[in-house]
């Protein structure tokens, strides 16, 4: 029973139901453990659970971040793409290629366009667009370079924008070579049809948020 609880929490992030625990305990046939794992891996909840780790790694958010933190109305297709990819057990090498350059590697697959959301999933400082002392495109590509390096090489690279990295083997020449890779990338919004039930979901979220907003307002007034 302990195994059933732990493996269910690990793979889909939810506890097993009472019926699932009873079914496992009463399953005396060989391969009971394997059947449980196979069913959990086939569950759509598996992708929802494990996609979170990738989305956290690349700093995905439904808003731009920074002080304005404006919403990204059409960020969700990339999130759904990652979930679906985990559920389909897509090989890692292909998963990476789809996110970095789906339009180049798979030009006959327009349905992979949401994968390119990887390049704009992180923080986007809108105020710097108007106030940066250098062309904003350079700062934007700097984010892409750091995103790629931290995700795939587990190291930072932004120091090398001005000088060779003091701790990691990233010289300035390598940094600007990576910037050149992303020089042709221009961020923009792609409009998607709203998902079924989105309005109802947002209404429910607003209902849940209202008490929190009230408490925050009362605390600030004290």
Which residues make up each language-model segment?
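Short, structured secondary-structure elements
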Residues: 3-202
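Short, small-residue-biased leader/transition segments that mark boundaries at the very start
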Residues: 1-2, 163, 204-210, 214-216
């Amino acid at each position: 029973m302990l195994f059933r609880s732990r493996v269910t929490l690990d793979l889909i992030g939810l506890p097993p139901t009472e019926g699932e625990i009873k079914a496992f305990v009463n399953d005396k046939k060989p391969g009971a453990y394997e059947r449980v794992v196979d069913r959990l891996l086939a569950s759509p909840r598996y992708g929802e659970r494990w996609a979170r780790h990738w989305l956290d790694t690349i700093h995905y958010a439904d808003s731009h971040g920074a002080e304005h933190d404006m919403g990204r109305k059409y960020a969700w297709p990339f999130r759904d793409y990652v979930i679906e990819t985990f559920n389909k057990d897509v090989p890692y090498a292909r998963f990476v290629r789809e996110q970095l350059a789906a339009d180049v590697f798979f030009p006959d697959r327009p349905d992979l366009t949401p994968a390119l959301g990887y390049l704009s999933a992180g923080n986007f400082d809108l105020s710097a667009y108007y106030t940066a002392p250098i062309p904003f495109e350079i700062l934007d590509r700097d984010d892409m370079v750091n995103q790629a390096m931290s995700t795939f090489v587990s190291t930072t690279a932004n120091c090398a924008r001005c000088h060779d990295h003091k701790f990691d083997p990233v010289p300035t020449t390598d940094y600007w070579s990576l910037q050149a890779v992303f020089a042709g990338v221009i961020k923009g919004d792609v409009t998607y049809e709203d998902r079924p039930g989105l309005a109802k979901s947002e209404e429910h979220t607003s209902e849940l948020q209202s008490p929190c907003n009230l408490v925050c307002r009362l605390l600030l007034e004290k």
